[in-house]
Amino acid sequence: IDANILVRMNNGAKGVIRSSQIATGEENNLRVNVYGDKGYLKWQQENPNKLYFLKENEPIRVLKPGHDYNYPISLNSSKLPPGHPEGIFDAMGNIYLGAAKAIRGDNFYDHEFPTIHEGVRGMDFIEKVIDSHNRGNVWLELEK
């Protein structure tokens, strides 16, 4: 640990801030733990969609973004419905980046983005699911 900082809040609450720039085995494990005499809150940057909340003599609750039990400021910060990680936009952007490279004629990696073949295969899969259901849930082969 590179630093231990003792703090006292305006209301008299005491706390400790512990920090380390380098900790063996950790990547970027930014976390915030708030312990009180009647419960605690825990949050980790590597698992950002969960806030652990414990009140004395109650089971641990896991709070997630986008749900009505959150405060309005939290709901306003969530851009997607519950269950969708905020990073989904970055993931989609990576797919679009690969496609843009191909359109521009730049070098790109094989399988960097789905091609027409994967799109047609996905549509075939959906058609087979519906067809299987309509025929009494029989096994069907996908086109190669």
Residues covered by each model-derived region:
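NAD(P)-dependent dehydrogenases' Rossmann-like dinucleotide-binding region
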Residues: 4, 14-20
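Glycine/proline-rich active-site loop of Rossmann-fold NAD(P)-dependent oxidoreductases
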Residues: 13, 26-30
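Glycine-rich phosphate/pyrophosphate-binding beta-alpha loops
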Residues: 18-27, 84-87
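Glycine-rich Rossmann NAD(P)(H)-binding loop
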Residues: 18-22, 35-37, 143
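C-terminal hydrophobic helical "lid"/dimerization subdomain
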Residues: 119-133
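C-terminal capping/lid region of NAD(P)-dependent oxidoreductase domains
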Residues: 131-144
